[in-house]
């Protein structure tokens, strides 16, 4: 009993027992981190080290967190299925998340809307499970990375995907888009994406 009591006191003093991150508390944890990183570190640890492997939903996680730009490159997002609006209006965020395993994600809609600083290489993402890319890069004004190798064969909605993405002009002509017969509404309206770089709709 004395050993257990000592261990609990030791953990309390030195901060080694941190609150696990779950679906139930991850939004609170992010909010706490943004408002007071020092206090959040005491509770959850540094955000770069969070174990998010049990989280399945990151929708709206950094939405409107306009000053957030911390390293989350090592997050294990392999269990995530929903990244809806994850970085919506996170206008300062521009960290390397290219090594994320997003193979379980089905919803990337609005993920980078108004994420005006983001321009990282995410070309190796496995998006083969994704069915929704609606407005994914809408007004992501800096983004211009090669995503031409993405497997988008499961996607059924690409409407407004690159609307006013004023820097984007990468080759998407090899995308497998058999689920989308014709160019979606406002797919790349007011962006520099050339006709030759667009997917060949209805083909694979």
Predicted segment positions?
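Regulatory input/activation interfaces that engage signals or partners
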Residues: 12
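Sec-dependent signal peptide recognition
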Residues: 2-9
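Negatively charged
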Residues: 4, 15-204
């Amino acid at each position: 009993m004395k050993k257990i009591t000592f261990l609990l006191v030791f953990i309390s003093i030195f901060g080694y027992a941190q609150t696990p991150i779950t679906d139930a508390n991850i939004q609170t944890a992010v909010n706490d981190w943004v408002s007071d990183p020092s206090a959040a570190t005491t509770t959850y640890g540094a955000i770069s080290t969070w174990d998010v492997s049990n989280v399945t939903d990151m929708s709206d996680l950094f939405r409107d967190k306009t000053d957030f730009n911390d390293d989350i490159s090592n997050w294990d997002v392999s269990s995530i299925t929903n990244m809806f609006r994850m970085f919506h209006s996170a206008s300062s965020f521009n960290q390397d998340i290219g090594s994320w395993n997003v193979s379980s994600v089905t919803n990337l809609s609005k993920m980078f809307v108004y994420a005006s600083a983001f321009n990282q290489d995410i070309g190796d993402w496995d998006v083969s499970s994704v069915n929704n890319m609606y407005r994914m890069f809408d007004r992501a004004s800096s983004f211009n990375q090669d995503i031409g190798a993405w497997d988008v064969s499961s996607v059924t909605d690409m409407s407004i995907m690159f609307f006013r993405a004023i820097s984007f002009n990468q080759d998407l002509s090899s995308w497998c888009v058999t689920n989308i017969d014709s160019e979606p509404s406002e797919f790349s309206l007011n962006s520099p994406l050339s006709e030759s770089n667009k997917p060949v709709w209805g083909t694979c």
